[in-house]
């Protein structure tokens, strides 16, 4: 009797874990960071999705700090809807210029397709969170 209950409990637990994973995997597997393309920004803006564009350079220590801060903030419930698009400062110069950004480490927040905030070289989690809130 005890063995049957344990097998039954194990089977129920296994099914529950499978269903939990099947439902949550698509949500959890969304990338925090996507490479920037104009088509992707347009699609997100048209859907009303909040967007943060990060102008980033791999050699930039400020950019690396910003990325760590964003990796901590974006999974939080408050910010989960925000999509992060990364512009390569060195490889996408035309995009950098189209945003009017003079420096790497520029963060630009969009809400309903409109720019609502911008910062350059900001590394404070509190201030970056304030910028993210503008896009919500």
Give residue spans per PLM region.
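N-terminal targeting signals for export/organelle localization
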Residues: 1-35, 136
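Extracytoplasmic/secreted envelope proteins and their assembly/folding machinery
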Residues: 38, 42, 67-71, 93, ...
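Short active-site neighborhood of thiol/selenol oxidoreductases, capturing the structured segment around
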Residues: 46-58
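Thiol-based oxidoreductase modules, predominantly thioredoxin-like and allied folds used
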Residues: 55, 79-94
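The canonical Cys-X-X-Cys-His
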Residues: 60-63, 107
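Typically the conserved alpha-helix immediately C-terminal to a functionally engaged Cys/Sec
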Residues: 64-78
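Structural micro-motif
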Residues: 93, 99-108
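Non-catalytic, surface beta->alpha helical segment in thiol-disulfide oxidoreductase systems
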Residues: 109-136
């Amino acid at each position: 009797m005890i063995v049957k209950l344990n097998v039954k409990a194990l089977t129920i637990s296994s099914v529950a874990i499978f269903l939990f994973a099947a439902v949550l995997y698509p949500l959890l597997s969304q990338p925090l960071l996507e490479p920037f393309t104009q088509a992707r920004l347009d699609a997100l803006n048209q859907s009303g999705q909040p967007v943060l564009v990060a102008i980033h350079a791999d050699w930039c220590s400020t950019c690396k700090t910003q990325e760590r801060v964003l990796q901590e903030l974006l999974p939080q419930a408050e910010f989960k809807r925000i999509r992060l698009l990364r512009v390569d400062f060195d490889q996408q110069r035309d995009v950098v210029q189209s945003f009017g950004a003079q420096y790497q480490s520029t963060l630009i927040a969009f809400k309903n397709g409109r720019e609502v905030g911008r910062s350059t070289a900001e590394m404070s989690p509190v201030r970056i969170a304030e910028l993210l809130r503008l896009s919500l």
